[in-house]
Amino acid sequence: MRPKQLLLVLVPVVAAACASVPDVAEPLKVLSDKTVTGFGWPESVGCDAQHNVLYVSQFGGDKPNPTAKDGLGYISKVAPDGKVIDKRYFEAKMNKPKGIWIAGTRLWVTDIDSLWIFDTATKQGRRVEIPGINFANDVIVSNGAAYVSDNRIDRLYRIEPADYLEASLQPRITLVWEKRNVFPNGLWVAKDGSLLMAGFESPEKHHGVYAMAANGSISELTPDIGRLDGLAERADGTLLFTDWDSGAVIRYGPMGEIQVLGKGFKGPADLCTLGKTLYVPDLVKGEIRIFELDR
């Protein structure tokens, strides 16, 4: 993406002389808010729009220890209404699977120091270890490469090709950057091609949402709001993200409007949308909240 395009997105007030100021986002209506219980510390819900199904990464075990290499993690295949279709859909031995990204029949999921890729049709999987990573958190795929965040040590990694399922392929793993004061957690590919990152730093230090342009420059899209986790951009250009500090899922508009869509979470993690439905896992409560929106 060209720097000029990024400027128009990030600084609409400065660009007002040559472009119209974005409209204030009309609030969404939450038509229903349903809670589905019984999950084993769910960290991410991946929405497979092509096959109208969900995949939920879970830590398993008696405690939600995100760094334990205990082989207790798994991914469930779940219907849009929250009913579990297959509790352990993939047979691979995972530890603490976290962020999920889905494209076609490929599913990527992070797992402490590794990135898995699966074929959702055949269930075949392959794991690659990411040298130097401390806490592989979220993953997205853009232009044939996978990007993995590490919010513990403030790093972003690239793995290419992203589709390395075949054993004959040896993916190239690159440290894109480190120590940029982003502490990237949730990732998303924006409509303009930039890479969006939700900041999460512990102890309780607030961050916002950031955009990385094709040239690697990073800009702030929002002020410092909280400790952010899941992230997505809606078709209308507004952002959805979860915040551990406020225990909420939030919609952020082009003029800085903040709309709380749901609150009362103890561990709001990696969200996704399927049509007008928003899915938000609560890692601490072991639940998934399902919000039906008006649009």
Predicted regions, residues:
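C-terminal motif of bacterial Sec signal peptides marking the signal peptidase cleavage site
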Residues: 16-17
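A short loop-to-beta-strand structural motif that recurs across blades of beta-propeller domains
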Residues: 67-76, 114-116, 155-158, 208-210, ...
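A short beta-strand motif characteristic of beta-propeller blades
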Residues: 29-36, 83-90, 124-129, 171-178, ...
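Bacterial N-terminal signal peptides that target proteins for export
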Residues: 1-7
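Beta-strand-rich domains and repeat architectures in extracellular enzymes and scaffolds
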Residues: 35-71
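Beta-rich, blade/repeat-based domains predominating
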Residues: 39-51, 91-106, 112, 131-147, ...
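Flexible "stalk/tail and boundary" regions
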Residues: 79, 212-215, 235-238, 251-259, ...
